[in-house]
Every structure is written in C-alpha cells, then in structure tokens.
Amino acid sequence: RLKLNIRLSGNVADRHEPSTPGALDLSGVTSIIQQAVRYPGLTPTYMSNGSLGLGPKLQGTPISWAECASFYRTDDNRFKANAELAYTPLKGLTLKCVGGYHYGASNNYDYRCNMILGDGRGTGPSSLTEQMTSTVYKTFQLLANYNIQIKKHDIMALAGYAWEDERSRNLSGYRNKFPSDETPYLDAGGADGQLNGGGGYDWAMQSLFGRIVYNYDQRYLFETTARYDGSSRFPTGNKYAFFPSVAVGWRVSEESFWKSAPSLHFFSNLKLRASHGVLGNNNIGNYPYQSVYKLGSK
C-alpha cells in the first residue's frame, strides 16, 4: 500500500580550452582552429632566435595563440533530486506526495594574456572576465486520485495542490593589466577600468486543481476540470485566477446502428467531442508590471 521512489542525478563538468591573447577580436579554441586553416603556410610561429613570430597582422599566429597562457574555462555543477510517496488506503484511491529539488551552478573564466612577440611588442593588455550563475528550482505536489467502476459506469476523480519556485543569481567582474599569467584572479588585476555587474530573478506559482471524468459504457463521456492558479509574475490584485472547463463526447462507433452497418466499418473508432473552457498563460517576463526594475548603485 505504501510505495516510495527516489531519483538522484548529478553532473560535474570542468571544461578547459585555449583562447586567444589580449586585444584580438577572436576568442575560443574554435576561432583558433578557423584561423589556422586560413593563415599562409609559410608564416613562421617562431623566429630563429626562439622568439615568437609577428604574423601577417602583427598579432602572432594561431599556433602561438594555442600555446600562450590564455584560456577559457567553465565549471558546471548540476544536482537533481526527485521523490514520490504513494499510499493506497483502499481500492481505487491513491494518495501521492511528490517533491523535487534542482540545483545548478556555473562559473566561466575568460583570461587573455599579453603575448610578447619577437620585436618586443605585446598583443594587448591581459584581462580576465569572470561570470558566476546559480539557480535553484523547487517543486511540491499533493495528489488524490480515485477510480471506481459500477457496471457500465466508470468514474475518475482527481484533486491536487501544486507549488513551484525558482531563484537565480548571477555575478560578473572584469579587470585587466595583470602583472603575471601565474595569477589569473580578479583581485590581481588593475583597479582602473574594472567592471562589475549582477542580477537575478525569482518566480513562484501555486495551484489548486480538480478533474472529474465520467464514462458510460465506453460511449458517452463527460469531463469537467477546474484550476485556481496564482503566479508571482502578475501584479497584486491579479495574481490569482479561476480556470474552469467542460467537455462532452460521444463514441459513435460503439453504437449498435454503426456496428450493424458494414458500409461504415472503415471507421474503426469515431468519436465526436465538444469542449469549452478558460485558459491562462504565465509564460511572460518575471516583472512585466514594473515600469522600472533595476539593480545597481550610482
């Protein structure tokens, strides 16, 4: 009568790839590969004295870019936990409690070194852009489902409550002019020209809902549903709304007059259905009712 299901999953990813040096309009290992097939084959990466070649644009060559201290790194961590507890106190009645927790965090680092070429010039000031994002999603449901069959009558009733919540935060920072490629950390860069930013969002929704389905002899169908939903994405006074619906159906192919007419048997299952209801939609921005919504300082 009592059943518990738990599902756990996680993912840890650490991606590290070369990137281009400072002041170049290109970035990432894909750009390095693309430029490598376009550069003249006789362009030297190293001079006879071991220093880096200038390249046709005085910015080095794709090979020297791939070997320099620039890098792009992504640390991504994901965790999901879902649990379902089901209880059947009597025949036809099932009670369920469902919950879920999802966590995700991502850190991105884009470091561009100042690569020194053979004539002593640098490609541009070193710089670091760092971005951090974390998101937490939670959900909870209570469900009661009842099924009963009395001769030719089939009845199904469902009632439930649902709640979900998501919160996300992000933070970014930028600095340049690092004294050494051995310390690619924001606090090691120069304070002049530094940039920072951040943001986030929150949303939540809760619902009460129910449904009744009646079926007589697999021929006549009746269904009614009702929802009372509330969303944080709407302003005070308009957060909650009621959404009813009703539907009727007639499976004509189960009638005796249909089955007794061989000329109609090319329709193995013919059902007529009519429905009417009210729908809602909260797939909008998180703060559309705010004329101004800005985080920061002057």
Predicted stretch roles:
Residues L85-Y87, Y146-I148, Y214-Y216, T224, ...:
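Residue-level signature of outer-membrane beta-barrel architecture
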Residues G237, F243-S245:
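Outer-membrane beta-barrel domain signature, especially the mid-to-C-terminal portions
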Residues L2-R78, K96-Q206, R233, E254-K298:
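Surface-exposed loop/interface segments of Gram-negative outer-membrane beta-barrel transport/assembly proteins
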Residues Q206-Y216:
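Structured alpha-helical segments in the cores of large, soluble enzyme domains
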Residues F222-S231, A274:
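Transmembrane beta-strand segments that form the barrel wall of outer-membrane beta-barrel proteins
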Residues A81-A83, L142-A144, A157, G210, ...:
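Membrane-embedded beta-strands of outer-membrane beta-barrel proteins
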Residues S232-N238:
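Solvent-exposed loop/turn segments connecting transmembrane beta-strands
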